[in-house]
Amino acid sequence: MLKGKTVVLGVTGSIAAYKIANLASMLVKKHADVHVIMTENATNFINPITFETLTGNKCLVDTFDRNFQFNVEHVALAKRADVFMVAPASANIIGKIAGGIADDMLSTTIMPAKCPKIIAPAMNTGMIENPIVQDNIKKLESYGYEIVESATGYLACGDTGKGKLPDAEVLQDYILKAIAKEKDMAGVRLLVTAGPTREAIDPVRYITNHSTGKMGYAIARQAMLRGADVTLVTGKVEIEPPIFVNVVDITSAQDMYEAVMDRSTEQDVIIKAAAVADYRPAEVAEHKIKKADGDMSIKLSRTKDILLALGNQRIEKGIQDQIICGFSMETRDLIENSRKKIDSKHIDLIAANNLKVAGAGFGVDTNVLTLITRDSISELPMMSKEECADMLLDRIMEMRKAADLS
């Protein structure tokens, strides 16, 4: 994903410096060329040899290192960088950069860098809330630096509050958003649904399905990385939503219907990847239903068909600049059933999979999709859900271009 990209990580004096070793390792696994610059104080928390071992590159600390290459080292690295992240960023380095002070290897390297620059503050709550530090952060934002929001939690000083460095996975996502993909979806407003719905029987029990939300979340993440303005309408799942995505949490099919329809006319692309219940209990018991001898039956009522409502709305309101994609899970007659859905629901595309095919369906990290339109069929091999998401988004962008919507 990051092959051919140069990532520069600036590490300052903070107990959170250990997290950057994990971040560097993660980036190397994605084939990035990772270079680490440390302040003198940072070396008291983690040894430069750690970063050299993980990245295969010299860790820079001393501006006047006699073992420099012919190029002025800090300028050469600044020119090569595709993205520059300072994490953890102390109040000191934030103040230096904001004030134009360049007196060590880190500050002299970030100063001439033209690439996207990301600052991840990490410090005591009292320090990060200090008006001077806040003014410096705002100043950097005004200069185009992206600021990573500090996490809240237990701090090394014993306090609990804001100032904690986010985990390496979050920091990595900031880097990926900056450089991992071409921003071919910039300006595209995309809504995707994900996960299951829950239809209450009583205060304790509900009807649901096996959806984990992985496919919908993969679509949301890949679209975000490609620059789209993403809204994720999601049922209850066990995975964290991607950063930089507008998340709308729902529980029932009716909740999802309302959340989607309320936002639908504002979207350029709608992808309905959620596994929405087709039926719900006609009545919800006020109290827990007690166990009794014999069988029990529950009367079910049909839920609203969100995909059909979207297709009908597009016709009724004359919306001509919107692509609607549905997901279909079949066990037989996959293409025939999918084409019927395209026609009956007035949509553009179905991403279909067969639950009986190995590597497809719920609870796995792969999928086997067939992308079906009125006049084309594209069968994809088994691949990761992230790769499936990209292939689906590629197809949608092709359709937008063909319709002169891009």
Question: Locations of the language-model features?
Answer:
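A cross-family phosphate/adenosyl-ligand binding-site feature
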Residues: 1-118, 124-213, 217-406
